[in-house]
Swiss-Prot record:
It is found in: Cytoplasm. Residues 327-402 form the B5 domain. NCBIfam families: pheT_arch. Mg(2+) binds at D380, D386, E389, E390. Keywords: Aminoacyl-tRNA synthetase, ATP-binding, Cytoplasm, Ligase, Magnesium, Metal-binding, Nucleotide-binding, Protein biosynthesis. This is Phenylalanine--tRNA ligase beta subunit. Tetramer of two alpha and two beta subunits. HAMAP family: Phe_tRNA_synth_beta2. The gene is pheT. The keyword rRNA-binding does not apply. It comes from Treponema pallidum (strain Nichols).
Length: 604
């Protein structure tokens, strides 16, 4: 779970009051958080970086794309608070301002939603950007298509606030952005920027500028091989002919995204009064949430937020022109009876609306249904249950009386679980290594790369990202994704997973069917059809299950080198040699043999 370090004095300043550790621990429950430590300085903070002998905090500066200043030790006379968040769905709480906002509003403080609306655009309202514009190259659509940003003006940045901004950007890029893979952020000196900006796709050979931490210009290739951030994140660009470059109207480079900023426009220092903050990535919702969160944070710190217009050369979910920060969230609904049923007690309407207000959610009551409008910095309401959880947290857990369960049952492992465990032990004995994968993925992984149609794929109604839009119907794509990332390891690779798969089916209770499935893969130059057939034979022999094989025609496998497995007179699985086109789609150069079994169908 995320752990954050925040400067105590800045936190209590934004909270508007001071409180002791016990009180803070109790109030943190509304954020599903715990106070882990409250007595160390920045010198002891392993997450936030260590002090160099010269008394400067250097690690977070080197790690963050958008900063180039160092913070003097004198700014950290007060202690830091280390807080563990028990929820990964609220990146807005990973900042000092975001956490202080929740605790302040939860305690009855006024919401600043009206203050945020002054700079937020939406589908109906477009705020004036006063000529601040970013034009996006059409060629970036398949590389890193989305970008958002804003300008923040105010009093000069203090060392503490600059340090906090660095920490927030790093957490968002590393955790929310999966180490800059889907999202990265940059911060620049706005007073030196000549608008409009161009977010271009350029050849790596055309890139040349002085990056952060360097004193002389480097070529694009040199940045990826010699600069610390290039060596760490250069793999994100290696598969593309063009790389994303952000430049201003004079041709001055702001950043080679998502690697590093330039040493001129990207060198933010203490005392700066105008900042341009941008976020780029592969998922538009994630990019907008990150920008909205940072804009609200800096607004809470007293800075004036000024929008920036983003002009695309291709269609996006919100059109070709989006002025950011942009409010895109959909309203969610939950019925009163659902709240009473899940929370286990009847609640009056006034209590429920108050609970939503304490979680900074706008709510309207319409005929027994609560219509909730999420805050601009949130995008974690996926289901009515999420809204009910907000009511629970808004009321605080102390106001719910514990109840002793009224039923008594004796538990035992199900037959399916016992069979699953036995199969795992057998496969480990056969030399296979167990893997665990996500159940969600993209159509590209589950269909396009596998030469399959999407006819029976289950689609999530409101996915957070395109990468997790569909429920897997087979484990084999997950095994191939692991093989792609394991090409550097010694062969042979023998891996398996036993987990859930789901697909649309007219025979299912809700039009879908969920199965416990076994998937296995063998990758090596010596792998053969006979070897994987022997594995199937040995596995079913140890399970004392007679079986037959029949000719199969699955587009994922080579025709004539695949077979269906039949047990109890029914088709329960398939195995064979993965089709060369599938391997090419996954960029795998080693022959692979794989198979899949419905574990539940093996039960008598």
């Amino acid at each position: 779970m995320p752990k954050i370090s925040i400067h105590e004095a800045l936190f209590f300043e934004l909270l508007g009051e001071r409180c002791d550790d016990d009180t803070l621990e109790r109030r943190l429950r509304s954020a599903k958080a715990e106070l882990e430590c409250s007595s160390f300085s920045v010198r002891e903070d392993k997450e936030g970086g260590s002090l160099s002998p010269g008394g400067e905090v250097c690690d977070p500066v080197q790690r963050t794309r958008g900063q180039a200043s160092c913070v003097r030790e004198g700014a950290f006379d007060a202690r830091l608070l280390k807080i563990e968040l028990n929820d990964t769905n609220r990146p807005d709480l990973w900042s000092t301002a975001g956490l202080a906002r929740l605790l302040r509003v939860h305690a009855g403080g006024a919401s600043r939603a009206a203050q945020y609306r002054a700079f937020l655009s939406d589908r109906c309202t477009v705020r004036d950007s006063y000529g601040r514009c970013v034009v996006v190259d059409a060629r970036l659509q398949t590389i890193r298509p989305f970008i958002a940003g804003f300008v923040a003006r105010g009093t000069g940045l203090s060392e503490v606030r600059l340090w906090d901004l660095i920490q927030t950007q790093e957490r968002l890029a590393s955790n929310f952005g999966r180490r800059r893979c889907t999202l990265s952020l940059g911060c620049y000196r706005a007073q030196d920027i000549c608008w409009p900006l161009a977010y271009r796709a350029v050849l790596l050979a055309e890139v040349s500028f002085t990056p952060l931490g360097m004193s002389m210009p480097l070529s694009g290739e040199q940045i990826l091989t010699q600069h610390p951030k290039g060596r760490e994140y250069g793999h994100l660009l290696k598969d593309y002919s063009f790389v994303p470059l952000l430049v201003d109207a004079r041709g001055e480079v702001l950043s080679l995204i998502p690697i590093t900023n330039s040493a001129s426009l990207g060198a933010v220092v203490t005392g700066d009064t105008e900042l341009f903050i941008e976020c780029s990535g592969t998922d538009m919702c994630a990019v907008l949430v990150a920008v909205n969160s940072l804009a609200c944070d800096l607004s809470d710190m007293g800075m004036q937020i000024e929008p920036v217009q983003i002009t695309y050369s291709f269609d996006t979910p919100w059109g070709r022109s989006v002025t950011t920060p942009f409010y895109f969230q959909e309203k969610r609904e939950v019925a009163h009876e659902q709240i009473d049923r899940l929370l286990g007690m009847p609640l009056p309407v006034a209590d429920i609306t108050e609970a939503f207000a304490r979680m900074d959610c706008a709510v309207q009551v319409k005929q027994g249904t609560y219509v909730v409008e999420p805050a601009a910095y949130r995008n974690d309401f996926l289901h009515a249950v999420d809204l009910i959880e907000e009511v629970m947290l808004g009321r605080t857990l102390d106001r719910f009386s514990p109840q002793v369960p009224c039923s008594f049952t004796v538990g035992r492992l199900s037959d399916l679980t016992l069979l699953t465990r036995k199969i795992k032990h057998l496969l480990v004995g056969f030399g296979y290594q167990e893997m665990i994968f996500h159940y969600l993925g993209s159509a590209r992984e589950f269909c396009t790369r596998m030469r399959c149609t999407a006819d029976d794929l289950i689609e999530i109604e409101n996915p957070l990202t395109e990468s997790y839009r569909f429920v897997r119907r087979s484990i084999i794509p997950c095994l191939l994704s692991a093989e792609l990332k394991s090409a550097h390891a010694l062969y042979p690779h023998r891996i398996f997973e036993i987990g859930k798969v789901a697909f649309c089916s007219p025979h299912g209770e809700h039009g879908t069917c969920t199965q416990q499935s076994l998937g296995f893969l063998n990758a090596s130059q010596e792998a053969s059809y006979n070897e994987v057939a022997s594995l199937v034979s040995g596995l079913l022999y140890c399970l004392k299950l007679p079986y037959q094989v029949e000719e199969a025609q699955d587009p994922r496998f080579v025709l004539g080198r695949q077979a269906s497995i039949c047990v109890h007179g029914s088709r329960v699985g398939i195995f064979g040699e993965i089709h060369p086109q599938v391997l090419s789609n996954w960029d795998i150069r080693m022959p692979c043999f794989a198979g899949e079994l419905d574990v539940g169908a093996l039960l008598p």
